[in-house]
């Protein structure tokens, strides 16, 4: 090999190494830019999540609509954390002549329903703005507790309404564990710490304590409904506070709701306006898609099988 050829090969190798280094640097720059954009987007999305969003609010008077949909509970769409900023925005908007609670829910946890109810009453008192609740398919249990915060409750004649009661449900696996040869090992400090363990036998003491807990929460529910509905309730109605449900037309007769109607008719009648604007939480892009993958199979199984706390919830399937 001549010196000239060797020099050429050396230069060629040097150039190739330099080009590879440039490519590596460009790759790092591109990766950094992509990461920066992703972090900026996620930060903005996190900032925007939960902020009230009012779509195309008209210049004139309108009714502000806040939807209560699905099961009520912490971490769900119908939670105090999600609905509180929407309710605040609805009451504070000057040309919103009234607030509508558009409800389609079987209920949920007593605490979340009570928090939402109490906040509506607080805002209504502070801003002196009328509130109506409009029930769609379901207006039961915890959802009904929220509805009684309104001045007027409206529903369709086929709406299912009522279910003033509390339920706690779960499963027992003692027989299955015995068949599978599985031994339950648990240690507690405090005799009530393992109350209603699904992997152990249910005792009479457990049943008595759970019943006392449910009855206390039920009493809170009844007190709120009685106070808010007042003389409109027919207290002689059989099953009124025992979890009974009625269709919309039946519910009017017993004072559970006030009148039959729909959203548009109700806002025209009670607020004297035609326009309605729905307030919704501002969600980041792809949040709905990501939500579907947020629970692992094991998490979902545990949530399904584990005993549930008290629920102000109406079950349509038994």
Short names for language-model regions:
Residues 1-132, 137-139, 145-156, 168-318:
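N-terminal organellar transit peptides
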Residues 158-166:
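Active-site loop architecture of trypsin-fold serine endopeptidases
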């Amino acid at each position: 090999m001549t010196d000239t050829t060797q020099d050429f090969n050396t230069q060629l190798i040097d150039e190739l190494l330099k080009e590879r280094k440039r490519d590596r640097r460009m790759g790092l720059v591109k990766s950094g830019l992509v990461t920066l954009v992703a972090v900026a987007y996620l930060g903005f999305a996190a900032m925007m999540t939960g902020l009230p969003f009012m779509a195309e609010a008209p210049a004139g008077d309108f009714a502000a609509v806040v939807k209560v949909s699905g099961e009520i509970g912490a971490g769900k769409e119908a939670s105090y954390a999600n609905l509180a900023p929407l309710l605040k925005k609805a009451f504070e908007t000057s040309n919103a002549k009234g607030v509508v609670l558009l409800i389609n829910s079987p209920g949920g946890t007593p605490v979340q329903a009570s928090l939402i109810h109490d906040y509506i009453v607080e805002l209504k008192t502070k801003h002196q703005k009328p509130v109506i609740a409009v029930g769609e398919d379901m207006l039961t249990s915890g959802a009904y507790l929220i509805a009684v915060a309104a001045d007027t409750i409206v529903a369709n004649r086929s709406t299912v309404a009522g279910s003033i009661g509390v339920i706690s449900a779960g499963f027992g696996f003692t027989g299955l564990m015995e068949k599978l040869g599985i031994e339950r090992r648990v240690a507690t400090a405090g005799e009530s710490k393992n109350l209603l363990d699904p992997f152990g036998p249910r005792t009479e003491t457990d049943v008595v304590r759970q019943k006392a807990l449910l009855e206390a929460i039920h009493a809170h529910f009844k007190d709120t409904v009685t106070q808010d509905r007042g003389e409109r309730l027919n207290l002689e109605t059989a099953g009124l506070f025992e979890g009974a449900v009625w269709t919309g037309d039946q519910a009017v007769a017993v004072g559970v709701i006030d009148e039959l109607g729909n959203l548009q008719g109700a806002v025209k009648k009670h607020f004297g306006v035609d326009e309605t604007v729905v307030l919704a939480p501002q969600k980041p892009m792809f949040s709905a898609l990501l939500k579907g993958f947020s629970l692992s199979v094991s998490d979902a199984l545990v949530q399904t099988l584990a005993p549930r706390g008290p629920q102000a919830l109406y079950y349509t399937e038994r």
